[in-house]
Amino acid sequence: THTVYSGGFWKDMGVAVPDYPHDAPWVWQVFEGDCPSWVHSVLDNFDDWLHYGIVTVNKLMPGRFIAPHVDTLYKMRQKVKREEMNTKGMVPVRVNLFLQDRLMGHYIEIENESWLDYKKGDYTIIRPNLVHSVANLGYEPRFTMQLTGFAKEEDIT
């Protein structure tokens, strides 16, 4: 997925799209049914509070990044509409699950806060409208899993 336009973030901010190198803002993604079976088993570990979950595995190669953006949760919103899901009393959330210990050059920032000491299995919750970015300035691929669904506010605070 090419992320240079950051889902319209630059346009919403009223600024020009930065002049990034063309091949820098790319992330490899595997969605839902194309993910290996173990990915869906991981999702099961969150089903006591994450409802209607869908999964994505991301691979960010060295020298690549995902510029500041706000998640639109497009695939999740499509699923809710298509399957007429009852999400009353819940908010959309994205769980960013780290599939490896942090390595040199692996970077995540959410609302101006960086997380530099995560371990494999740690996760963070990305709420709607939170500006965040990731980068791989290291020498090995960076792997994460996204679990996107709906949760009750009291379950994620």
Model-derived features: positions:
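A short hydrophobic beta-strand segment most commonly corresponding to one strand
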Residues: V93-F98, Y123-I125, Y139-I156
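A short secondary-structure junction signal
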Residues: A67-D71, Q78-V80, H106-N112, N136-L137, ...
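Extracellular structured ligand-interaction cores
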Residues: Y52-V55, G63-F65, P92-N96, V131, ...
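Conserved short histidine dyad/triad with adjacent acidic residue
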Residues: V57-M90
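A short beta-strand-loop-beta hairpin characteristic of the jelly-roll/cupin
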Residues: M90-K119
